[in-house]
């Protein structure tokens, strides 16, 4: 199973939004992130800047 950590702006521990995200949904103005354990966060005004599937992380940035 490939789960990814989600960060704001850069891959640093203090920028970590959610660990082991199983789903990232993007709509016009929001990014919704959810784990397999049901934890979720909705980030308004962000976009997906980078997805690294080899290192299992996602970077979000403010629009």
Segments from the language model and where they lie:
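Compact, glycine-rich, soluble single-domain proteins
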Residues: 2-63
């Amino acid at each position: 199973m490939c789960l990814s950590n989600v960060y704001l702006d850069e891959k640093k521990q203090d920028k970590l939004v959610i660990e082991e995200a199983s789903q990232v949904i993007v709509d016009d103005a929001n990014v919704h992130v959810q784990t397999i354990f049901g934890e979720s966060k909705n980030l308004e005004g962000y976009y997906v800047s980078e997805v690294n599937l080899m290192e299992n992380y996602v970077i979000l940035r403010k629009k």
